[in-house]
Each structure stands twice: as structure tokens, then as C-alpha cells.
């Protein structure tokens, strides 16, 4: 399903709420030149980090690379393009895509290297950067519990990027920690099943 040159959002914050089993399956296939959209590139020995180490990623759009020295090495060697985006801005760009918006305005990054190549707008005397929405071909997300209709429950911090990414991709695959044959209680649902295309168990 996932092919070369696809753009892929991957939920999680370091190792919390990451669809690690799906990423292991991707590593078993000969898929490369992926554009990764995630909070971070994890660590070299885990999930997103293994994709970097195995040179499956051509571009990473992330907020943080400090826990994976291989990301920095490949970036400095010109082997990997890295677009560093402030974390709040990254989330808002994804949210904007999911909501069908044309972008977001943020004061974060004005007057810094983040501003380079971006449109600066002044509103009521304050400068803002215009940030384009981020959408992907695939979103790989995690679910603490998923029912057979694709409704997802996320516990605690596992919500992180998973909730917003589910709205901003053409195809959404959720990795279920627990699969429920019974429908989830509506009060439990974090991500409605309408956003989910496939369930991986």
C-alpha cells in the first residue's frame, strides 16, 4: 500500500503513542524516498529512527532531531533534507490541513532562521509568519483501544500528534493496542472512525 515517494505522518512523541509495529512492517518492505512528518525522528534503534538509519527517508519535517544522531549526520552530509518546524507551528499546520484551511499565521519564528523564504504579514502592528498547511498521503497513528468501526480511544499522553494527524491524510492506518469487538462508548472516543481507513492489530 505504501509506495516510494509517499508522504507519511507518524503519530507519537518519541516512544509515546507511536505505531511501532506498523513501522517495523514498513522496514521489511523495500519502500524508500519517504517524506516523514512527525514530532521527531525518535532514537536510532526505534520506530521512526530506524527508518532514518536505514535511509528510507528523503525529507523529514519535524520539530526535534536531537535524540537521533544519525538524523543530524545525514542532514549535515546532504543525504537527508530536514525541515525543522517549531512544535506548536507543526501541529497548527497539520490542524489547518485537516480543517481545510489555507494556512495559519503565527508569531513564532519571526526574525529568526524560521522566517527565511516565508511570507511575513503585519496585522495590528504585530508581525506574523504565514505557514502553509501540511497534508500527507498516509497517517500512521496509534490507538490504545480501537473498535471494529475504527473508533479510537487514546489514553493520556498517547493522544499527542495522533488526534490531529488522523484528520490530515488521504489514508489513515491505526495500530490498535487492543481491538474491541464491541463498539466503544461515545464518551470514550478520541478519534471517530470516520477518519480511519484501516486497522492494524
Which role does the model predict for each range below?
Residues 1-201:
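Conserved alpha/beta enzyme-core scaffold
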Amino acid at each position: 500500500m505504501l509506495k516510494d515517494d509517499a508522504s507519511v505522518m507518524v503519530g507519537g512523541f518519541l516512544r509515546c503513542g507511536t505505531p511501532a509495529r506498523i513501522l517495523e512492517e514498513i522496514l521489511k518492505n523495500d519502500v524508500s524516498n519517504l517524506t516523514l512528518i512527525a514530532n521527531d525522528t525518535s532514537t536510532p534503534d526505534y520506530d521512526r529512527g530506524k527508518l532514518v538509519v536505514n535511509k528510507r527517508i528523503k525529507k523529514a519535517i519535524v520539530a526535534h532531531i536531537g535524540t537521533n544522531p544519525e538524523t543530524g549526520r545525514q542532514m549535515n552530509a546532504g543525504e537527508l533534507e530536514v525541515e525543522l518546524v517549531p512544535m506548536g507551528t507543526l501541529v497548527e499546520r497539520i490542524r489547518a490541513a485537516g480543517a481545510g484551511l489555507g494556512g495559519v499565521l503565527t508569531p513564532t519564528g519571526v526574525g529568526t532562521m524560521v522566517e527565511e523564504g516565508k511570507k511575513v504579514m503585519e496585522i495590528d502592528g504585530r508581525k506574523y509568519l504565514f505557514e502553509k498547511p501540511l497534508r500527507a498521503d498516509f497517517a500512521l497513528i496509534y490507538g490504545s483501544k480501537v473498535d471494529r468501526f475504527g473508533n479510537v480511544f487514546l489514553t493520556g499522553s498517547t493522544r499527542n500528534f495522533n488526534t490531529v494527524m488522523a484528520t490530515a491524510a488521504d489514508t489513515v492506518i491505526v495500530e490498535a493496542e487492543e481491538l474491541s469487538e464491541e463498539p466503544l462508548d461515545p464518551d470514550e472516543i478520541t478519534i471517530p472512525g470516520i477518519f480511519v481507513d484501516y486497522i492494524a492489530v
